[in-house]
Amino acid sequence: MSSVYLRTAGVVCAVLILGGCVARKPASITEAQPEGPPKPMACVPAKSGDPMVGTWYSNSKPRGVSGDFQALTVLYADGRMAYETQLKIGRKTRPALRETGCWSVVDGIYTMQTTQSNGEIVDAADPIYVNRYRVEKVEKTKLTLRELKTGGQVVTARRMPQGYRLPY
């Protein structure tokens, strides 16, 4: 009886396995369509005579960083921006970032949206590429901003001549 039982169980298993193979539909193979290059972001031109248009240099000592953080920001009237930073520790200067993108001021909030970092196109949806500051004061030769976070640091920049570059 056990050999009949084993034979029957073997036949049932074989039928189930074959039935499973017959009932399955072949998986359709779809090729991934390559994504096209991301569409460039359209910058919004600044208002005519906007006092923030120009070249701004700041030198600060961020919390938790031992050294001077230097930043050069160029804000163009057409809404484009270029942002370059370097960190100076003692006599050594370390270049950090070279970013380009768009800028705007809405309701007293200055926003920089990076579209390229060190020559590479970035994911515009990534929040690391958006910097926001409250505009505290804009003078002819001085710009005062505050980071938009609890206990945000004040950043003071001074206007530089067009074409000014960071000292290396």
What are these regions (language model features)?
Residues 1-19:
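Sec-dependent bacterial lipoprotein signal peptides
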